[in-house]
Regions:
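Conserved catalytic core of sirtuin-type NAD+-dependent deacylases
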Residues: 1-407
Length: 407
């Protein structure tokens, strides 16, 4: 039985970080440290099998999209900070319960309006800049908002926890656009659609997690849903997989599967196929082996790890940082608040190192990354030959599993 890589929430606060280097508590010092981190010669501790020892792989989380108007988990306006009782739906609950799916899709229906209005911010576009200059070779993201693909489609990006832009049928495995699914939900739930129009579309900006909104009863979550306490979730309807409805699959015992819908095409209890699920890794669900292997290879092929906007609370992300550390890779972390097990990543650094061996800072990624890119561009224009620092082996990179999955 495959071990489930749980997205463990760690709702409690993590210990505060120790800023590294010590002068990186100022914006100027932090930019200098990150510049040194990205331009330093490859670590001598790296194993001989590293494909591109001068390259950097990025590992990103919900904090990166806060400036886009989305919620994170543990920031000052994060889900776990403002709503201590928050509990996500688990994969086994989604599979087993028609009522649980009604609640999930009702909340997702409201949350999709927020996500649709939002888009990449300056941090995402700065990552494009790092890629264009040759500093970033690939991105591993825990985020499901697709902002990386919009901001830098040419930079290989592995979506570790999937994405919200599509759904997958649990029976026939066909995929459906989330935009098309949203239109169907509006048709099946006209009262909810009117509520959505009045409450969300009439606003100029996306709903954000604030104390005021929590008082009103609204709260947004990083995985793209909105909680409205007291809402009649049991009245919500969601469609069956259109492919399964037209061509019911055979069950394992050789009988044709049963799929019942109401007069409008909504899935009815008693059906045993045709359940649509978001193309994300839910809490308690296993990450696909090919995605797990591609993430490991992205780490193994690079010489540095830059962690952005994540506390690494999920095991699937933390294990990648741990893998990088075990392989002798320098690690830099930009995140507000503590990071899971971060003392293990930095305990062996020399006190007088200036960032080349590791960096730990607390700044908004939307603030520091654009200035980091500007500083690197200024150094480039001053005559520094980055090709002596960056030496990517393009032909070998074309053959790695990350590229295979993304192609």
């Amino acid at each position: 039985m495959t071990k489930s890589l749980l997205r463990i929430p760690y709702p409690g606060p993590l210990p505060p970080p120790k800023i590294i280097p010590r002068n990186a508590d100022s914006l100027t010092g932090a930019i200098a440290a990150l510049t040194e981190f990205l331009t330093a010669p490859p670590s001598r501790s790296l194993p001989d099998d590293v494909l591109d020892p001068a390259s950097t792989v990025l590992l990103t989380g919900a904090g990166l999209s806060v400036a886009s108007g989305l919620a994170d988990y543990r920031g000052t306006s994060g889900t776990y900070t403002l709503k201590k009782s928050y509990r996500p739906i688990y994969y086994h609950e989604f599979l087993a319960s028609h009522e649980a799916r009604k609640r999930y899709w009702a909340r997702s229906f409201l949350g999709w309006a927020n996500l649709h209005k939002a888009g990449p911010n300056s941090a995402h576009f700065s990552i494009k800049g790092l890629g264009d200059m040759g500093f970033a070779r690939s991105v591993i993201t825990q985020n499901v908002d697709s902002f990386h693909l919009k901001a830098h489609p040419e930079l290989p990006t592995l979506e570790l926890h999937g994405y919200l832009r599509a759904l997958i049928c649990l029976s026939c495995h066909s995929k459906i656009s989330r935009d098309e699914f949203q239109k169907t939900l509006m048709q099946l739930n006209p009262i909810w659609a009117a509520f959505l129009e009045e409450t969300f579309f009439s606003r100029a900006n996306p709903i954000k997690n604030t104390a005021e909104n929590f008082t009103k009863g609204f709260s947004t979550n990083p995985d793209g849903d909105v909680d409205v306490p007291g809402a009649p979730y049991s009245m919500f309807r969601y469609p069956a997989c259109p492919n399964c409805f037209q061509n019911p699959p055979m069950t394992t015992n050789g009988l044709k599967a049963k799929i019942d819908v109401d007069n409008d095409g909504a899935w009815k209890a008693g059906s045993n196929v045709g359940i649509l699920k978001p193309s994300v890794v839910m809490f308690g669900e296993s990450i696909a082996s090919e995605v797990k292997e591609a993430a490991e290879q992205a780490i193994d092929n690079s010489g540095r790890l830059l962690v952005l906007g994540t506390s690494l609370a999920t095991y699937s992300a933390w294990r990648l940082a741990k893998r990088a550390k075990d392989r002798g890779m320098p690690i830099a972390i930009i995140n507000f608040g503590g990071v899971r097990g971060e003392e293990e990543f930095f305990h062996d650094l020399q006190i007088d190192q200036n960032g080349g061996a590791g960096v730990r800072i607390e700044f908004g990624t939307e603030i520091i990354l654009p200035q980091l890119v500007a500083n690197l561009q200024q150094i480039r224009f001053s005559g520094t030959d980055f090709t002596k620092i960056l030496n990517p082996n393009i032909e070998k990179l074309k053959n790695n599993k990350l590229q295979d999955i993304l192609s």
